[in-house]
Amino acid sequence: MILNYKFQNFMSFQDNVEFSMMAPNTEVKERFPDNYVHVAPACDILKTAVIVGENAGGKSNFVRSLKYFKKYFKENEYVKSYRNRVHVNCCEGYCGKRGNTLQCFELEVWLEKECFYLYHLEMDFVGIVKEELGYKGGVGEEYEYIFKVIRDQLDLDCDKDGYPCTGDNQCETKAFVDYDLDIPSYGKEMEELISKAVTNWNQMGLFITKLAILGNEHAFRFSDWVKNSLCPETNSV
């Protein structure tokens, strides 16, 4: 079940958007005991939520953001932001170097018993900027990250360097990137082996899906939940 969901710079949403299914500790909750699920001490999750707003207010784009997020788990394709999926104010022509193409997605879920996951993804027109998965076994505990990937080097080579940038789509840009990978439970030797196995970081897909294939329990459980249980669909009335 979803606890919290955040995203930024997606279609009509430029600023950070936050959505929570956590039931508030108010008298309203007590009047509707069938509208929430008690999963752990001090943790009640709403069963349903209604998103309301005027026409063209962003309701459909909110659902599209979840679909966009989910597709990288199902299709395992090249992870990057696309011009038609970032806010119009963040685009300056066709040149990704001139605009703000950084997109952020964060999903916190409860799966079963006292099993909580927090997944964070940042990407731009080059690829993944940051990706991490955290796990905790109780509400009062702190998240301990299962893995963390951070892009620590980026060199962009444009065939129009030295000339005034026109912002059109006639130039060709090549990116040279490097990442810092941290998997506490695997140790440095295994991290180095995984790093060498991924010959092209830029087009590697989500790291969590690779870790799931290697048998990491937490990466598999979260990825499986996103692919098979997260069902973002619109219901027009």
Each PLM stretch: what is its role?
Residues 118-237:
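Electropositive, glycine-dotted interaction segments
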Residues 7, 107-113, 133-137:
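Short acidic, glycine-rich loop/turn motifs
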